[in-house]
Swiss-Prot record:
It catalyses: N(6)-carboxybiotinyl-L-lysyl-[protein] + acetyl-CoA = N(6)-biotinyl-L-lysyl-[protein] + malonyl-CoA. The keyword Zinc-finger applies. Zn(2+) binds at residues 33, 36, 52, 55. Keywords: ATP-binding, Cytoplasm, Fatty acid biosynthesis, Fatty acid metabolism, Lipid biosynthesis, Lipid metabolism, Metal-binding, Nucleotide-binding, Transferase, Zinc, Zinc-finger. Pathway: Lipid metabolism; malonyl-CoA biosynthesis; malonyl-CoA from acetyl-CoA: step 1/1. Belongs to the AccD/PCCB family. The keyword Chaperone does not apply. Component of the acetyl coenzyme A carboxylase (ACC) complex. Biotin carboxylase (BC) catalyzes the carboxylation of biotin on its carrier protein (BCCP) and then the CO(2) group is transferred by the transcarboxylase to acetyl-CoA to form malonyl-CoA. One of its GO terms (biological process) is malonyl-CoA biosynthetic process. This is Acetyl-coenzyme A carboxylase carboxyl transferase subunit beta.
Length: 285
C-alpha cells in the first residue's frame, strides 16, 4: 500500500490553465494593410473607401462597395446576377474552385454589372472583383460585359468598366481568349454610336484583360500605384535581357508614357466620374 502511494506521487500531473490573454476581438473587426502592415478598424477603413490611413495604399474594394461609392443611393439595378460558369474543357477541379469562390465571396462570377445613376445621370457599369478566381475573364465575364455594353448602346448610355484581373481564365482555354475579341466588338459598336466608354483600371490588371477592353477606353483612368501590364516583370526582363525601371507597370509609369489620361485618388473617384458624365451629357444634348 505504501509502495503504491510513493509510486503514484512520482507520476507527472498536468493542469490546464485558461489563457487570460485570450483574443476576444470578433473576426473582421480589424484589418491589416497589406503594404505597411498597420492594423485598423475595418469600419473606419470602409468609411475611408479602403484607403490606408498610414501609407495611403489603395486596398481592394469589393464590386458592390465600388458601385455603392459611385452611384446614387438605391439606383443600382443588377443585370444577369444568376449567370455561372460551366466547365467546357472538363478541366479537373474547376467546378470545385468555382463553388469555393462563390461561397467565399457571395458572388456567382468575377464581375458585377448593371445600370446606376450618379448625380442623377444614368450610366452602365461593370466591376470586376479579384476575390473571385483573381478576377480572371472566362465565358461568363465576357458575356456579362457584352450584354451590359449592348444595353448601353441600345439605350444610349455612357459605360464605365472597372478592371481588376489576372487575365484570361486558363481553365476555359480558347473560349476565355475569345472574350478579348468579343468584348472589343461590343465596345466598337458602342463607340460607333457616339457614346462614352470610361475604362477605370485598378490593381492588378494584367494579361488578356489589360490587352483588350481595359486599354481601349475613350478615357483611361487608374488608381495610384496600380499594377497594370500584360506579361510579368520577370518574364520581360528575361526576354529582353535588361533590368526594368522600378516603377515599370505602375499607373504612374503608364501615365508618364501616355497610356493613361489620369491617375485618381480614390477619394476623388466619385467627383471625377460625375464631372466627366456631366460634360458628356451636355455635349450629347
Amino acid at each position: 500500500m505504501f509502495k503504491d502511494f510513493f509510486n503514484r506521487s512520482k507520476k507527472k500531473k498536468y493542469l490546464t490553465v485558461q489563457d487570460s490573454k485570450q483574443n476576444d476581438v470578433p473576426a473582421g473587426i480589424m484589418t491589416k494593410c497589406p503594404k505597411c502592415k498597420k492594423i485598423m478598424y475595418t469600419k473606419e477603413l470602409n468609411e475611408n473607401l479602403n484607403v490606408c490611413f498610414n501609407c495611403d495604399h489603395h486596398i481592394a474594394l469589393t464590386a458592390y462597395k465600388r458601385i455603392e461609392a459611385i452611384s446614387d443611393e438605391g439606383s443600382f439595378i443588377e443585370f444577369d446576377r444568376g449567370m455561372t460558369s460551366a466547365n467546357p474543357l472538363d478541366f479537373p477541379g474547376y467546378e470545385e474552385k468555382i463553388e469555393k469562390d462563390q461561397q467565399k465571396t457571395g458572388l456567382n462570377e468575377a464581375l458585377v454589372s448593371g445600370t446606376a445613376k450618379l448625380d442623377g445621370i444614368q450610366y452602365g457599369v461593370a466591376v470586376m472583383d479579384a476575390r473571385f478566381r483573381m478576377g480572371s475573364m472566362g465565358s461568363v465575364v465576357g458575356e456579362k460585359i457584352c450584354r451590359i455594353i449592348d444595353y448601353c448602346t441600345e439605350h444610349r448610355l455612357p459605360f464605365i468598366l472597372f478592371s481588376a484581373s489576372g487575365g484570361a481564365r486558363m481553365q476555359e482555354g480558347i473560349i476565355s481568349l475569345m472574350q478579348m475579341g468579343k468584348t472589343s466588338v461590343s465596345l466598337k459598336r458602342h463607340s460607333d454610336a457616339g457614346l462614352l466608354y470610361i475604362s477605370y483600371i485598378t490593381n492588378p490588371t494584367t494579361g488578356g484583360v489589360s490587352a483588350s477592353f481595359a486599354s481601349v477606353g475613350d478615357i483611361n483612368l487608374s488608381e495610384p500605384k496600380a499594377l497594370i501590364g500584360f506579361a510579368g516583370r520577370r518574364v520581360i526582363e528575361q526576354t529582353i535581357n535588361e533590368k526594368l525601371p522600378d516603377d515599370f507597370q505602375t499607373a504612374e509609369f503608364l501615365l508618364e508614357h501616355g497610356q493613361l489620361d489620369k491617375v485618381i485618388h480614390r477619394k476623388d473617384m466619385r467627383e471625377t466620374l460625375s464631372n466627366i458624365l456631366k460634360i458628356h451629357q451636355e455635349v450629347s444634348n
